[in-house]
Protein backbone atom coordinates (compact mmCIF):
# COMPACT_ATOMS: atom_id res chain seq x y z
CA UNK A 1 0.00 0.00 0.00
CA UNK A 2 1.12 3.51 -0.68
CA UNK A 3 1.81 5.70 2.29
CA UNK A 4 -1.16 8.11 2.48
CA UNK A 5 1.13 11.11 2.98
CA UNK A 6 3.26 10.48 -0.10
CA UNK A 7 1.92 12.39 -3.13
CA UNK A 8 2.53 9.50 -5.50
CA UNK A 9 0.91 9.87 -8.95
CA UNK A 10 -1.43 7.12 -10.13
CA UNK A 11 -0.06 4.24 -12.16
CA UNK A 12 -0.65 4.86 -15.85
CA UNK A 13 0.00 1.45 -17.40
CA UNK A 14 -2.85 -1.02 -17.11
CA UNK A 15 -0.60 -3.87 -18.31
CA UNK A 16 2.09 -3.58 -15.63
CA UNK A 17 4.04 -6.84 -15.52
CA UNK A 18 6.15 -6.22 -12.44
CA UNK A 19 5.48 -3.76 -9.66
CA UNK A 20 7.94 -2.93 -6.91
CA UNK A 21 7.64 -0.47 -4.07
CA UNK A 22 9.97 0.92 -1.43
CA UNK A 23 9.17 3.10 1.59
CA UNK A 24 11.93 4.75 3.61
CA UNK A 25 11.67 7.04 6.63
CA UNK A 26 14.62 8.84 8.20
CA UNK A 27 14.58 10.42 11.66
CA UNK A 28 16.90 12.55 13.75
CA UNK A 29 17.68 10.97 17.09
CA UNK A 30 20.04 13.04 19.16
CA UNK A 31 22.88 13.96 16.84
CA UNK A 32 22.31 10.97 14.56
CA UNK A 33 20.18 10.51 11.44
CA UNK A 34 18.81 6.97 11.35
CA UNK A 35 16.90 4.91 8.82
CA UNK A 36 13.89 4.52 11.09
CA UNK A 37 11.68 2.53 8.72
CA UNK A 38 12.24 0.48 5.58
CA UNK A 39 9.47 -1.44 3.82
CA UNK A 40 9.64 -2.98 0.37
CA UNK A 41 7.70 -5.13 -2.05
CA UNK A 42 9.24 -6.73 -5.10
CA UNK A 43 12.79 -6.14 -6.35
CA UNK A 44 13.61 -2.86 -4.60
CA UNK A 45 16.04 -2.87 -1.68
CA UNK A 46 18.50 -0.71 0.20
CA UNK A 47 21.92 -1.52 1.52
CA UNK A 48 22.59 -0.85 5.17
CA UNK A 49 22.81 2.75 6.36
CA UNK A 50 26.31 4.16 6.05
CA UNK A 51 27.95 7.13 7.78
CA UNK A 52 31.04 8.26 5.84
CA UNK A 53 30.45 11.88 6.98
CA UNK A 54 29.74 11.10 10.61
CA UNK A 55 26.52 10.23 12.40
CA UNK A 56 24.62 13.34 11.36
CA UNK A 57 24.32 12.34 7.69
CA UNK A 58 22.89 8.95 6.69
CA UNK A 59 23.93 7.54 3.30
CA UNK A 60 21.76 4.90 1.61
CA UNK A 61 22.11 3.10 -1.73
CA UNK A 62 18.89 2.17 -3.54
CA UNK A 63 19.13 -1.23 -5.22
CA UNK A 64 17.05 -2.67 -8.04
CA UNK A 65 18.56 -6.15 -8.49
CA UNK A 66 17.14 -6.76 -12.00
CA UNK A 67 19.34 -3.78 -13.06
CA UNK A 68 16.84 -2.69 -15.69
CA UNK A 69 13.21 -1.69 -16.18
CA UNK A 70 11.12 -3.32 -18.90
CA UNK A 71 7.81 -2.39 -20.48
CA UNK A 72 4.94 -2.60 -18.01
CA UNK A 73 7.15 -2.40 -14.92
CA UNK A 74 6.35 0.18 -12.23
CA UNK A 75 8.83 1.22 -9.53
CA UNK A 76 7.13 3.18 -6.75
CA UNK A 77 9.42 4.87 -4.20
CA UNK A 78 8.34 6.97 -1.21
CA UNK A 79 10.83 8.67 1.11
CA UNK A 80 10.24 10.76 4.22
CA UNK A 81 12.81 12.78 6.16
CA UNK A 82 11.77 13.83 9.65
CA UNK A 83 12.65 17.17 11.21
CA UNK A 84 16.39 17.98 11.08
CA UNK A 85 17.29 14.63 9.45
CA UNK A 86 19.91 14.62 6.67
CA UNK A 87 20.06 11.79 4.13
CA UNK A 88 22.09 11.13 0.99
CA UNK A 89 20.52 8.71 -1.49
CA UNK A 90 22.12 7.32 -4.62
CA UNK A 91 22.20 4.23 -6.84
CA UNK A 92 25.12 1.85 -7.49
CA UNK A 93 24.94 2.18 -11.28
CA UNK A 94 22.93 3.41 -14.22
CA UNK A 95 19.23 2.63 -14.50
CA UNK A 96 18.58 0.87 -17.81
CA UNK A 97 15.24 1.27 -19.59
CA UNK A 98 14.89 -1.73 -21.87
CA UNK A 99 13.35 -2.05 -25.31
CA UNK A 100 9.59 -2.42 -24.90
CA UNK A 101 7.67 -1.67 -28.12
CA UNK A 102 4.32 -0.10 -27.31
CA UNK A 103 4.56 -0.58 -23.53
CA UNK A 104 5.30 2.07 -20.94
CA UNK A 105 7.61 1.54 -17.98
CA UNK A 106 7.48 3.88 -15.01
CA UNK A 107 9.51 5.02 -12.04
CA UNK A 108 7.71 7.33 -9.63
CA UNK A 109 9.43 8.88 -6.63
CA UNK A 110 7.73 10.93 -3.92
CA UNK A 111 9.85 12.60 -1.23
CA UNK A 112 8.70 14.62 1.77
CA UNK A 113 10.96 16.73 3.98
CA UNK A 114 9.88 17.98 7.39
CA UNK A 115 11.15 21.24 8.91
CA UNK A 116 14.92 21.56 8.87
CA UNK A 117 15.48 18.30 6.98
CA UNK A 118 18.18 18.12 4.32
CA UNK A 119 18.34 15.84 1.31
CA UNK A 120 20.93 14.95 -1.32
CA UNK A 121 19.23 13.00 -4.15
CA UNK A 122 22.00 11.71 -6.43
CA UNK A 123 20.94 8.80 -8.67
CA UNK A 124 23.24 7.73 -11.45
CA UNK A 125 22.10 8.18 -15.02
CA UNK A 126 19.16 6.71 -16.90
CA UNK A 127 20.07 4.87 -20.11
CA UNK A 128 17.14 4.73 -22.51
CA UNK A 129 17.41 1.82 -24.96
CA UNK A 130 16.05 2.04 -28.47
CA UNK A 131 12.25 1.42 -28.49
CA UNK A 132 11.99 2.07 -24.74
CA UNK A 133 9.07 4.12 -23.40
CA UNK A 134 10.00 5.37 -19.91
CA UNK A 135 8.02 7.67 -17.65
CA UNK A 136 10.23 9.18 -14.94
CA UNK A 137 8.31 11.05 -12.24
CA UNK A 138 9.63 12.89 -9.18
CA UNK A 139 7.69 14.87 -6.57
CA UNK A 140 9.51 16.65 -3.74
CA UNK A 141 7.54 18.42 -1.01
CA UNK A 142 9.42 20.52 1.55
CA UNK A 143 8.33 22.01 4.85
CA UNK A 144 9.60 25.50 5.74
CA UNK A 145 13.28 25.44 6.63
CA UNK A 146 14.02 22.23 4.71
CA UNK A 147 16.60 22.13 1.91
CA UNK A 148 17.41 19.74 -0.92
CA UNK A 149 19.89 19.21 -3.73
CA UNK A 150 19.21 16.67 -6.45
CA UNK A 151 19.66 15.81 -10.08
CA UNK A 152 18.65 13.60 -12.94
CA UNK A 153 20.78 12.54 -15.91
CA UNK A 154 19.37 10.79 -18.97
CA UNK A 155 21.12 9.35 -22.02
CA UNK A 156 18.99 8.59 -25.07
CA UNK A 157 20.40 5.49 -26.74
CA UNK A 158 23.37 3.24 -25.98
CA UNK A 159 25.98 5.11 -27.94
CA UNK A 160 28.94 3.27 -26.44
CA UNK A 161 27.42 0.11 -27.97
CA UNK A 162 26.71 1.84 -31.29
CA UNK A 163 22.94 2.02 -30.70
CA UNK A 164 21.15 5.33 -31.18
CA UNK A 165 17.64 6.17 -29.98
CA UNK A 166 15.58 5.89 -33.17
CA UNK A 167 12.24 4.67 -31.81
CA UNK A 168 10.43 5.16 -28.53
CA UNK A 169 9.09 7.87 -26.30
CA UNK A 170 10.14 9.45 -23.02
CA UNK A 171 8.21 11.49 -20.46
CA UNK A 172 9.83 13.20 -17.48
CA UNK A 173 7.91 15.05 -14.77
CA UNK A 174 9.44 16.94 -11.85
CA UNK A 175 7.52 18.80 -9.15
CA UNK A 176 9.24 20.79 -6.40
CA UNK A 177 6.82 22.13 -3.80
CA UNK A 178 6.82 23.87 -0.43
CA UNK A 179 3.87 22.97 1.78
CA UNK A 180 2.05 21.77 -1.33
CA UNK A 181 2.58 25.02 -3.25
CA UNK A 182 4.61 24.78 -6.47
CA UNK A 183 8.16 26.11 -6.57
CA UNK A 184 9.09 24.59 -9.93
CA UNK A 185 7.23 22.15 -12.16
CA UNK A 186 8.53 20.72 -15.41
CA UNK A 187 6.91 18.16 -17.70
CA UNK A 188 8.69 17.00 -20.83
CA UNK A 189 7.49 14.38 -23.29
CA UNK A 190 8.74 13.61 -26.78
CA UNK A 191 9.42 10.69 -29.08
CA UNK A 192 12.60 9.67 -30.85
CA UNK A 193 11.69 11.56 -34.01
CA UNK A 194 10.85 14.82 -32.24
CA UNK A 195 12.47 17.98 -33.64
CA UNK A 196 13.30 19.00 -30.05
CA UNK A 197 16.26 16.61 -30.17
CA UNK A 198 18.01 18.67 -32.82
CA UNK A 199 16.62 22.13 -32.08
CA UNK A 200 18.98 24.75 -30.67
CA UNK A 201 16.30 25.51 -28.07
CA UNK A 202 16.07 21.79 -27.24
CA UNK A 203 18.87 19.22 -27.04
CA UNK A 204 20.83 20.68 -29.97
CA UNK A 205 21.93 17.26 -31.21
CA UNK A 206 23.27 16.13 -27.83
CA UNK A 207 22.00 12.80 -26.48
CA UNK A 208 22.71 13.31 -22.76
CA UNK A 209 20.75 15.83 -20.71
CA UNK A 210 20.95 16.52 -17.00
CA UNK A 211 19.27 18.86 -14.55
CA UNK A 212 20.46 19.78 -11.07
CA UNK A 213 18.12 21.56 -8.66
CA UNK A 214 18.85 23.10 -5.29
CA UNK A 215 16.10 24.35 -2.98
CA UNK A 216 16.65 26.31 0.21
CA UNK A 217 17.45 29.64 1.77
CA UNK A 218 20.96 29.50 0.31
CA UNK A 219 19.72 29.26 -3.29
CA UNK A 220 20.29 32.85 -4.40
CA UNK A 221 20.81 34.77 -7.61
CA UNK A 222 24.31 35.67 -6.44
CA UNK A 223 25.15 31.98 -6.05
CA UNK A 224 23.80 31.27 -9.55
CA UNK A 225 25.95 34.04 -10.99
CA UNK A 226 29.04 32.64 -9.28
CA UNK A 227 28.36 29.19 -10.72
CA UNK A 228 27.66 30.58 -14.20
CA UNK A 229 31.19 31.97 -14.45
CA UNK A 230 32.62 28.44 -14.20
CA UNK A 231 30.27 26.53 -16.51
CA UNK A 232 31.47 25.14 -19.87
CA UNK A 233 30.05 25.92 -23.28
CA UNK A 234 31.80 23.59 -25.71
CA UNK A 235 30.95 21.28 -28.58
CA UNK A 236 30.94 18.30 -26.21
CA UNK A 237 29.60 19.85 -23.00
CA UNK A 238 27.32 22.82 -22.36
CA UNK A 239 25.67 24.09 -19.21
CA UNK A 240 23.66 27.02 -17.92
CA UNK A 241 22.22 28.04 -14.56
CA UNK A 242 19.41 30.24 -13.27
CA UNK A 243 17.66 31.04 -10.01
CA UNK A 244 13.89 31.11 -9.57
CA UNK A 245 13.06 33.48 -6.73
CA UNK A 246 9.72 33.26 -4.93
CA UNK A 247 7.38 36.16 -4.25
CA UNK A 248 5.72 34.67 -1.18
CA UNK A 249 7.60 35.24 2.11
CA UNK A 250 9.13 32.15 3.64
CA UNK A 251 9.16 30.15 0.42
CA UNK A 252 12.62 29.04 -0.73
CA UNK A 253 14.14 29.88 -4.08
CA UNK A 254 15.17 27.21 -6.58
CA UNK A 255 18.53 27.11 -8.32
CA UNK A 256 18.48 25.17 -11.62
CA UNK A 257 21.42 23.99 -13.69
CA UNK A 258 20.99 22.27 -17.05
CA UNK A 259 23.72 20.36 -18.85
CA UNK A 260 23.96 18.85 -22.34
CA UNK A 261 26.71 16.33 -23.06
CA UNK A 262 27.93 13.67 -25.44
CA UNK A 263 28.84 11.27 -22.63
CA UNK A 264 27.02 10.63 -19.34
CA UNK A 265 30.33 10.59 -17.48
CA UNK A 266 30.93 14.23 -18.42
CA UNK A 267 27.46 15.30 -17.30
CA UNK A 268 27.80 13.42 -14.02
CA UNK A 269 31.24 14.90 -13.36
CA UNK A 270 29.95 18.43 -13.87
CA UNK A 271 26.89 17.91 -11.69
CA UNK A 272 29.00 16.23 -9.00
CA UNK A 273 31.39 19.17 -8.98
CA UNK A 274 28.46 21.58 -8.71
CA UNK A 275 26.87 19.54 -5.91
CA UNK A 276 30.10 19.71 -3.91
CA UNK A 277 30.16 23.49 -4.33
CA UNK A 278 26.50 23.81 -3.29
CA UNK A 279 26.56 21.75 -0.11
CA UNK A 280 27.96 24.50 2.08
CA UNK A 281 25.57 27.29 0.98
CA UNK A 282 22.50 25.01 0.76
CA UNK A 283 23.05 22.51 3.59
CA UNK A 284 25.69 24.17 5.74
CA UNK A 285 27.99 21.14 5.52
CA UNK A 286 31.22 20.62 3.63
CA UNK A 287 31.16 19.04 0.20
CA UNK A 288 32.76 15.59 0.17
CA UNK A 289 32.96 13.28 -2.87
CA UNK A 290 30.69 10.25 -2.64
CA UNK A 291 32.79 7.37 -1.36
CA UNK A 292 30.08 4.96 -2.54
CA UNK A 293 30.95 5.66 -6.18
CA UNK A 294 34.65 5.05 -5.60
CA UNK A 295 34.21 1.43 -4.48
Swiss-Prot record:
Subunit structure: UreD, UreF and UreG form a complex that acts as a GTP-hydrolysis-dependent molecular chaperone, activating the urease apoprotein by helping to assemble the nickel containing metallocenter of UreC. The UreE protein probably delivers the nickel.
HAMAP family noted in UniProt: UreD
One of the Pfam families matching this protein, by short name: UreD
PANTHER family noted in UniProt: UREASE ACCESSORY PROTEIN D
InterPro entries associated with the record: UreD
GO terms for cellular component: cytoplasm
Protein name in UniProt: Urease accessory protein UreD
Phylogenetic placement of the source organism: Bacteria, Pseudomonadati, Pseudomonadota, Betaproteobacteria, Burkholderiales
Family: Belongs to the UreD family.
Role: Required for maturation of urease via the functional incorporation of the urease nickel metallocenter.
Taxonomy, superkingdom: Bacteria
GO molecular function, one term: nickel cation binding
Swiss-Prot/TrEMBL keywords: Chaperone, Cytoplasm, Nickel insertion
Cellular compartments annotated: Cytoplasm
